[in-house]
Amino acid sequence: MSEHQSLPAPEASTEVRVAIVGVGNCASSLVQGVEYYYNADDTSTVPGLMHVRFGPYHVRDVKFVAAFDVDAKKVGFDLSDAIFASENNTIKIADVAPTNVIVQRGPTLDGIGKYYADTIELSDAEPVDVVQALKEAKVDVLVSYLPVGSEEADKFYAQCAIDAGVAFVNALPVFIASDPVWAKKFTDAGVPIVGDDIKSQVGATITHRVLAKLFEDRGVQLDRTMQLNVGGNMDFLNMLERERLESKKISKTQAVTSNLKREFKTKDVHIGPSDHVGWLDDRKWAYVRLEGRAFGDVPLNLEYKLEVWDSPNSAGVIIDAVRAAKIAKDRGIGGPVIPASAYLMKSPPEQLPDDIARAQLEEFIIG
């Protein structure tokens, strides 16, 4: 397990002050989800959350205090309006009252690919000083929801989090928590990070990972496997630009294969986005096939299709990740939060079996 650097713990507050970068479908589901479970009973079990009260923090303790985007239909608008604006097309689960949080113009950098650029209008507002904005809003945790392939932009916001002393939750497949150089930056600064690349509650990756492990545990030789995903949101449109996909494919592939003992040839594992189908909106369809050999080398094949609303499928996981990051911040812990990263992320610094990762995260919550 990685070493953490502990600094004198700041006085813990009763709320988790969150900033969001990238006010897309995932941000919409996150904000709506906090509203949906605002009055949930502490002891109840609700879909998609480890606990209603995660350590000292209830879902309703998550407060959105800042947001950054580049879309002209979102920048300058209240967060409650921006989450339903422009190309956002996820399912609505809750009404959201005005937040008095105005979406600010962040720097574009490499955050907009060619398909995004053809679809949205960029705000002509001047980018704000992100570090100053984080400090002024007294942010505890910054959640990065930038589009896939935003390497430069994600690292820019990661550095802003370090400079502002704000915990960082890296929801996209840019390797920061799992990069030893970046991990050391966060450790040296005494700033916690949970990353990289958020898992869904029950998505293509987790089902594929579990079934591949089931093959191995039951003595079936897994010879080859594939996972194809189609969806209708801006994430899938962005991923038509294959040059932005390298880290996404690596993240999804290692999330499945890292749980297995055997090594695979590159051609025997194909995992990644496939196409954009506009009428699916924020739904994702995953087609997964596993081919193996059972007793006597007799073929044993499994094929399934998973249909989900993509963004709500990870919103609860982010709520847990945010609260884990805040607990680490309260305790003065810097660097990657291994238990939270291993259980909640596809590409953590340290891959652990899911049951062990969950047990370690439960221990972390208790302290």
Curated annotation (Swiss-Prot):
Residue numbers binding NAD(+): D78, A137, Y157, S200, D235, K248
SUPFAM superfamilies per record: Glyceraldehyde-3-phosphate dehydrogenase-like, C-terminal domain (SSF55347), NAD(P)-binding Rossmann-fold domains (SSF51735)
Parts forming coiled coils: none
Catalytic activity: D-glucose 6-phosphate = 1D-myo-inositol 3-phosphate
Cofactor: NAD(+)
Superkingdom: Bacteria
Enzyme Commission number(s) of this protein: 5.5.1.4
GO biological process: inositol biosynthetic process; phospholipid biosynthetic process
Keywords: Inositol biosynthesis, Isomerase, NAD
GO MF annotation: an example: inositol-3-phosphate synthase activity
InterPro entries per record: MIPS, Myo-inos-1-P_Synthase, Myo-inos-1-P_Synthase_actino, Myo-inos-1-P_Synthase_GAPDH, NAD(P)-bd_dom_sf
Functional summary from the UniProt entry: Key enzyme in myo-inositol biosynthesis pathway that catalyzes the conversion of glucose 6-phosphate to 1D-myo-inositol 3-phosphate in a NAD-dependent manner.
Matching PANTHER family: INOSITOL-3-PHOSPHATE SYNTHASE
Similarity annotation: Belongs to the myo-inositol 1-phosphate synthase family.
Name the UniProt record assigns to this protein: Inositol-3-phosphate synthase
